[in-house]
């Protein structure tokens, strides 16, 4: 994390940055080290400075298997660095991400793998240490207020509304930024923002949204859809003057190849 601070200050010359590691993979030790490192980053040569402003945060990394269950990822960023104004613990997302890291009976590298690849043995050993540390943290009771939970347990929220509620129970009002909403590895096709605009999902707490990243972009709302119909039996949308669905374009490419091979359109 010190490298990230130095890069922000001396290389990229950005005005501010935030650490937002995945909450599902965090532990009490990592969270404390994160807070300590960010506080140290706010100092230069032993004096507090504002040449670059670092923020403490975490990522709520929700993955749903269907569009109805998928809410996506949220970066949670806190304005202040004082202990009382930070979450007692990162709050992870229930479901796929938590189950994969914490509840999966597999996941550890068998010792034989490190032996067979002896030059990289330390990497395998470090991975197993990482997984074991995560899984050794007990899950917080779900029926207690977030403010009353121990700082050494793992807390998770199933929905954006639940996430906001738990933060409010600690009297916290951080910046929450939805991001990574493009279809692909963790976002089921036909997913949309519709269900997240309902009042119980607390959309008023998410005042800005990521519009571009390495995952893709979500810069503007458009009324058309890539696919229509049931997810198990999807139908490609027809093109419009403003939009050519990728599935339709794929069909055009296949058709052209068939015609070049002398096949008929039928």
Give names to the regions the model predicted.
Residues 1-266:
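Extended, charged catalytic domains and RNA/DNA-binding interfaces, predominantly
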């Amino acid at each position: 994390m010190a490298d990230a601070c130095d890069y922000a200050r001396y290389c990229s010359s950005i005005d501010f940055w935030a650490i937002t590691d995945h909450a599902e993979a965090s532990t009490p030790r990592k969270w404390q080290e994160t807070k300590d490192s960010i506080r140290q980053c706010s100092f230069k040569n032993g004096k507090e400075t504002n040449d670059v402003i670092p923020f403490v945060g975490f990522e709520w990394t929700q993955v749903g298997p269907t569009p109805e269950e998928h809410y996506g990822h949220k970066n949670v960023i806190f304005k202040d660095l004082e202990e009382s104004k930070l979450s007692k613990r990162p709050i992870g997302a229930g479901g796929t991400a938590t189950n994969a890291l914490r509840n999966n009976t597999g996941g550890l590298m068998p010792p034989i793998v490190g032996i067979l690849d002896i030059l990289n043995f330390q990497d395998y050993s470090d991975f197993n240490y990482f997984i074991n540390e995560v899984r050794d943290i007990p899950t917080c009771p779900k029926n207690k207020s977030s403010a009353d939970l121990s700082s050494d347990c793992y807390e998770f929220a199933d929905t954006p509304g639940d996430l906001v509620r738990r933060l409010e129970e600690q009297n916290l009002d951080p910046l929450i930024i939805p991001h990574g909403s493009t279809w692909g590895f963790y976002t089921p096709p036909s997913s949309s923002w519709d269900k997240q605009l309902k009042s119980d999902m607390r959309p008023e707490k998410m005042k800005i949204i990521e519009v571009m990243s390495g995952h893709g972009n979500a810069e503007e709302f458009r009324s058309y859809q890539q696919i229509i119909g049931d997810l198990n039996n999807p139908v490609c949308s027809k093109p419009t003057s403003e939009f050519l669905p990728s599935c339709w374009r794929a069909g055009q490419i296949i058709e052209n190849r068939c015609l070049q091979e002398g096949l008929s359109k039928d």
